[in-house]
């Protein structure tokens, strides 16, 4: 009887682990420039996370996640990104977790919208010992706006489990928000929020939802390099309590500008 009572809670904890701490990023609306590629390494370490195996998914406590993301601009407003996810967990060693592909399109500048607007669809597979979703689809509208030194980005994301032994195919709402301010010429300091509130057709108790706040730094002013790092605090029982993240990117132009 006790296991039956706990099953919905354990399912919620696994289901609502926002972004699974592999790719912790709030996207801006602009797509990668045509004829250029950015190589990004996402390095995340969970200082205080889940210590038990839950529904076949291995613990996140003291896990190191290294994700390679390669994004190429195809046209002036269309890009394709690919991901390779890896995991190093004490007691389990190094393993490749899975791979994703993510096409994204942005609104043309000719539309003269008051905000930046784009949309991505991310499809991928991952091993069942690292995720309750074997195949998943993420639909991500992206809205952003720059006011002088203040920057705001919204990613009201919907994640769909395509193949899973545990999760429904009903979309899960995962809102992400970034608010940053340019305190110095080449430095943005801000707050990033990552959440997962549950299936769109039913409400979850707050402790079964995932909510995390990251205090983040962004390097500005470089056309060739990208740097973001931050420390995240989990706000509910369903969220890893303390996570550090670093995103390091290098941009390459394949066609020389005249």
Ranges and model annotations:
Residues 1-22:
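Bacterial Sec-dependent N-terminal signal peptides
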